[in-house]
Amino acid sequence: MLRYLLKTLLQMNLFADSLARDISNSSELLFGFNSSLAALNPSLLPPGDPSLNGSRVGPEDAMPRIVEQPPDLVVSRGEPATLPCRAEGRPRPNIEWYKNGARVATAREDPRAHRLLLPSGALFFPRIVHGRRSRPDEGVYTCVARNYLGAAASRNASLEVAVLRDDFRQSPGNVVVAVGEPAVMECVPPKGHPEPLVTWKKGKIKLKEEEGRITIRGGKLMMSHTFKSDAGMYMCVASNMAGERESGAAELVVLERPSFLRRPINQVVLADAPVNFLCEVQGDPQPNLHWRKDDGELPAGRYEIRSDHSLWIDQVSSEDEGTYTCVAENSVGRAEASGSLSVHVPPQFVTKPQNQTVAPGANVSFQCETKGNPPPAIFWQKEGSQVLLFPSQSLQPMGRLLVSPRGQLNITEVKIGDGGYYVCQAVSVAGSILAKALLEIKGASIDGLPPIILQGPANQTLVLGSSVWLPCRVIGNPQPNIQWKKDERWLQGDDSQFNLMDNGTLHIASIQEMDMGFYSCVAKSSIGEATWNSWLRKQEDWGASPGPATGPSNPPGPPSQPIVTEVTANSITLTWKPNPQSGATATSYVIEAFSQAAGNTWRTVADGVQLETYTISGLQPNTIYLFLVRAVGAWGLSEPSPVSEPVQTQDSSLSRPAEDPWKGQRGLAEVAVRMQEPTVLGPRTLQVSWTVDGPVQLVQGFRVSWRIAGLDQGSWTMLDLQSPHKQSTVLRGLPPGAQIQIKVQVQGQEGLGAESPFVTRSIPEEAPSGPPQGVAVALGGDRNSSVTVSWEPPLPSQRNGVITEYQIWCLGNESRFHLNRSAAGWARSVTFSGLLPGQIYRALVAAATSAGVGVASAPVLVQLPFPPAAEPGPEVSEGLAERLAKVLRKPAFLAGSSAACGALLLGFCAALYRRQKQRKELSHYTASFAYTPAVSFPHSEGLSGSSSRPPMGLGPAAYPWLADSWPHPPRSPSAQEPRGSCCPSNPDPDDRYYNEAGISLYLAQTARGANASGEGPVYSTIDPVGEELQTFHGGFPQHSSGDPSTWSQYAPPEWSEGDSGARGGQGKLLGKPVQMPSLSWPEALPPPPPSCELSCPEGPEEELKGSSDLEEWCPPVPEKSHLVGSSSSGACMVAPAPRDTPSPTSSYGQQSTATLTPSPPDPPQPPTDIPHLHQMPRRVPLGPSSPLSVSQPALSSHDGRPVGLGAGPVLSYHASPSPVPSTASSAPGRTRQVTGEMTPPLHGHRARIRKKPKALPYRREHSPGDLPPPPLPPPEEETSWPLGLRAAGSMSSLERERSGERRVVQAVPLGAQPLGAQRGPHPDAALLGCAAEEAWLPYGRPSFLSHGQGTSTCSTAGSNSSRGSNSSRGSRGSRGPGRSRSRSRSQSQSQRPGRNRREEPR
């Protein structure tokens, strides 16, 4: 109601706003609305309206035109929405909306509609309605504008509802990766429209993509390589217009593979010395460490693994040599680091070299023999030279210096320059030793010149603690005196740190950091002096000692004597030639000059001369100069060339003041450059700074040179700076991870000045920029579960540092098959084991430096073969099982399975309920039996007489007096169906006769019938060996005769005289037809017994014992039984005498199972009298051949119908003592006469009642023994039978139905009514032509029952009828009469004349 009021108010407001804006528009709107109505119904238009015939169109009228088209909308459920539509036309068109072709009802037309049509024509939805089953607002809408001139339609606009379900189709799962590995978290969002957008959150922070590392594609969160900081809780977020959904949190666990902080190193120790291998690792989770020896066991008793995981071995011996490996592993990965141990004996001299003095041109040899373990290597070195002489290596073309394989040094044709100390060194892995000897040359002197330094000290980089020799070999005459100074400080000979030898060599035994600096060798004599400068500096840890020379490694030989070619006042031009015997190539030349006018020393006047000719400028005029030339090579300066001849410059001008010819060179030599510590600015970039001391006015620029440290032969890379004031520069493009040596040299007008000591700086490492080379994958030893991955290091230019380790991945087609390993930097292969056979793997290798992991190699595919005894089927099935498991875990499958199980459970419950209900409905069928006779009309050919067909010879055909619903015996396919049946399947339920006798009385009657005679002329044929009779078989011990020729004849005629009013046969209808036995009724019915065979047993009636506990159970109906009537007189029944029995066997009464009324018992008879059913003779009764007497005067019913067509009285027939067997008919209903006294007790053996199991839930299909007895044929005479047929045939169906009204007659005690009230002349007796005395009718004619024929039933329904009425149980004293289920008892009794009299047997 509230919603309706809101809609109404909204409509009113909209309409009021429209009126306020434009009243004329409202009138036009009204006009348009009326026009649209008229367009829809032309009868509404006034006569002559132009919209009827189109002949009167206004000059300004126009057809509608859509000017604003409705757009496509996607809206959220529950939100308002508007589909705009505006149209033009005159008169103003009316707007209508259509959805999917159907007109849309708005609130203007239907107050219940939730859509509103706005004055502008727009369709307004206050709230979009959308559900799982009902989606009324979603669809395709069309706006139609109409006036009398026509209509215009808009475009089709779709309105879609945004939907976003709650459940994610796949929620992200926890992921565990190692640092550096890729990680993928998958998420499939819930279904929605529009398709939801997927984003990710870490905690509460939205993730953003990082180029090259974090990518979000299709709901997947992909990380190319993970960091430790990536660990955390991640959520998948799906959003669209309908809202936002967050998945459950998934954890990303980033573990760290073991990595070494300190690795074990290779160690060489002497025997009996201890050794310690360090190993320190980190990882997450904390790795476990253990040690192993690759080629043996750890030395027992001498090793110890300390708390810091280091391996300590004491007193090592040669047996301990080998490789020791530290193994660290955790759940993420495994890492190994190895160190080797070597135990050696240091080398020792066997023969040492001795000093020798020879003349120039002679040959000389120095012996040097050593020993050690392993054997040491021997090499020679001339003191002060960097050249090493190894065995079998010729250093000069003529081979003057040669070392033999035994270590002997041989010098041929000794020259003056060969003099000096020669050092023999023996080196092995255990250590090194050396010894030296002096070679002196006789007659080598120069007179009148300052000392000449033949070989001076070289610049050296030394390791702290090492020994160093600084040679200073000088010639001169007189013999010069050699002195040393360090950093401009003279060294004294008594200094314990420095040892000044006799030949001028300075020896420093164990150099310390304080010993580093500038050293100068000064040779002085009386004529002059000579100076040679050099420096020493500390070698850093990264430094490397120079290796053996691979080519000529000695300095170039001395050039030839320089020759003066041109002389001026200020310059001299010199020419020389290189030494042809030099083993090394001269790269440049240095020119030295001496002039007594300039001083008493040799000075360098030119440096870096590239050609063999040079012009020395800046000389003083008219001055004598001497020159010598030195060659410069990769291994240092050569010895000086022979001194040139003296040369004097020209005299230019006597007035010009004399100038110092060495002023420029001397000034640059005094400029000192001091380097500062370089600064790393970035990758591959270094800033170099320096300071300048001395005469800076002579400096015109600087030369900055650098090279990779450890390569003394490496070339320098130079950068010239032309600015004298710039004292810093930036070096770019430096190799990563390398140690760089840098030096600075000043530049002036006269050339280059002194060099600065070089400094060393490390360039930061970078991750390798190139992948490892030659990656290959080979199958392992087992060839189906392991592979070996091998590789080579990256190219040197791509390493960018020292390779510390390699990362190797072996990736399967799923993340759970991924494996990874790490290997040391020196390793070249690794083996993966435990792989799955048949799986395809990709192998990748990446090198790593301290800066990180570099570029991985291209994947190399390898597929492991299946084992020989295995096939790929299990693998495929395993994969299929895994895929099925994934499908089973999907929410959609679980929801569908739950729905299916629920539907099955619901169906099962419904079936169970229906079955229970049917059981309840059929519960009375389980313990009851009934039959409903129906009217049948015979065919003439079936009733023509005894000659055309046997009297009972229906054969396999059905009985015409039985309803079609009565089960018939089996027939052959050729048997014909009985014709003339009426109402075969739907008998009138009102035409049933109910017997209220309880089950207890029924059982009691059955027990009494076991040894009693029958109750009337109704016969019961029971197969004593039938299946259903086994229940009651114990109650008939006298029926155990095995004679197959005997028949059972019973039911004396005295019992047939009871009036119908005294026969209260009551019944109940069977639920369904049941199967008939294979035996037909004509085969089972015996001829009627004579009346003389019956006798009356006497004795008081005895109440059945144990009946109360059986009242709720009803046994199955016997296979074939006939209704039994009770006698109406108080006379006792007479048992048949054997002598009066016309039958071949004696007949004994057997209680009919079709009645529930107790009957007098029969006296015990011999068991041989009762044959089994299958032993009875199949005799055909003949027609009547002797006069018959009917036991009752009237044969028609009270309704005027012949006997057999109505519920008339039961007749009793007596067979005459004729040898020809007679036939008898039975009444259609079962009647009995109940006396006022108790039923006489049974005589003889009490029938033992066998209780039938109660386990049967219901009985739809009854066995042959469950059938109620069929009615016997009606009595007839030759003259009365046609009449009976005519009466039956002349009745209409309506009359027959009326004749079927139920009449339940109360049993009246004997003597309670006068005989005349009980019996009287039957109104139809004359019609049938029957005499008052009893007569016999021929037996064998079929009886035709009316449609309303009564039935008898045993019931266990929860009513009084289940326990029986007083009358059905028998009255006891004051017990009243039985109940009546039909019309009044008085009316029923008044219509029946009293016929109760006792018939004596004839």
Swiss-Prot record:
Q: Give residue ranges for domain Fibronectin type-III.
A: 558-652, 672-766, 771-869
Q: Where is the composition biased (Polar residues)?
A: 646-655, 1038-1049, 1142-1152, 1346-1357
Listed under GO biological process in this entry are: axon guidance; axon midline choice point recognition; chemotaxis; commissural neuron axon guidance; neuron migration; positive regulation of axon guidance
Q: What span is annotated as the signal peptide, if there is one?
A: 1-20
**Residues on the Cytoplasmic side?**
913-1402
Mark out the compositionally biased spans (Basic residues): 1243-1254
Q: Which family does it belong to?
A: Belongs to the immunoglobulin superfamily. ROBO family.
Query: Would you tell me the protein name for this molecule?
Result: Roundabout homolog 3
Species of origin: Mus musculus
